[in-house]
Amino acid sequence: MIKEQQPTPPVHKSLWHGGFAMLALAALLLAASAYMLLALIPIGRAGNVDFVVSQPTAHMWYSLAYAVGLFFFGPLCNWLVQRYRRGIVCVRATELYAACIVVSWFVFRGMLPVDFFGLVALRFITGAFYALAVMVLLNTLVIDKSESNMRTKANHIMAWLLRFGMVLGPLVAIVVSRKAAVSDVCVWALAAAVIAAVLVRLVHLPFKTPEEDLHHLSADRFLLPGMWRLFFFTCLCFACFGYVFSFVSSVAFYAMMLVGFLWALISERFNSVFVHSDTNLLVAFFFILSAMSVFCSPDGMLPGYFTPCLLGAGIGMAGARAQLMFIDSSGHCRRGTAVTTFLLACESGVAIGLAVGFAIAN
């Protein structure tokens, strides 16, 4: 008589075990670190820092170079995580990203003179290594450390942590720049990146045998085909934040955006059906358009604190629903690809919005 095979019991009954918690904190720190760096130009413009305002038309190109760099390692991502130990790939990418922060600190201190093309190259490389670290973290490590029935929830939590990092990064950068030199923001960004690398290094990750038919360049873990309209919509929503990000250097603005995020989270908590409906996207887009109509008006920020709160709620709702749509369209085997596609839509949207804001300001 053949004995029936028993299903393998889950390794972790709860999503929030030690390994997942460390990866979650690493994701938050990485995002905060990147957005501390992105906040340097708006803060420098507001404070009239010579390095930042010396080339008025260059800021747009710095942001565009960063946006292009985000996609650089995408075709290699699947090969890298299968050819080498996936945790080490994330750690090394984070370390190289941290090295870019060190170079940025020398540049801002005036100790490393570089021309326009050197700065464009620096922003490109910074975006490339940051994106590689976050891609591997989200599309591979988080999935490896989550049970199959908890992976959508895990992806959802990570995306929210990245959004909080987008706001906490500039918030910390503004506070630090007011208490010390603008270049000291790089020190805080470096500390966040180093701690993130240490956290990832401490997580035990299982070894997996690489695929037999492995190609150096692949769309796996990079871009999900057939999702261009949703990619464009997500990119557009986050570009609105990037545009406002280009000229706002107020603690109150980012604090109220955090309130907007909490608003979106509460709406998810008490109305889960609403989160999974397309009505959520319409409401989110209405919130974003309402906020942007105020920011683009001649009166600017006159309506007060409610406008950034509305923008935060809209971006939070749109991001949450768009991510679920990416995952639902991918199927089980391409979850990592869907997560990366959503990530790149968000990050490139912010960078493009920054470029547009700098171009209009100039």
PLM regions and their residue ranges:
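Symmetry-related core transmembrane helices of the 12-TM Major Facilitator Superfamily/SLC fold
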Residues: 184-202, 362
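Transmembrane alpha-helices of Major Facilitator/SLC transporters
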Residues: 70-72, 253-277, 284
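A late C-terminal transmembrane helix in Major Facilitator Superfamily
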Residues: 330-361
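Hydrophobic core of transmembrane alpha-helices in multi-pass small-molecule transporters
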Residues: 114-133, 302-318
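C-terminal ends and interior cores of transmembrane alpha-helices
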Residues: 95-113, 286-299
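C-terminal transmembrane helical hairpin of 12-TM major facilitator-type secondary transporters
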Residues: 277-322
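Glycine-rich segments within core transmembrane alpha-helices of 12-TM secondary carriers
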Residues: 150-174, 343-354
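Cytoplasmic helix-loop-helix junction between adjacent transmembrane helices
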Residues: 122-161
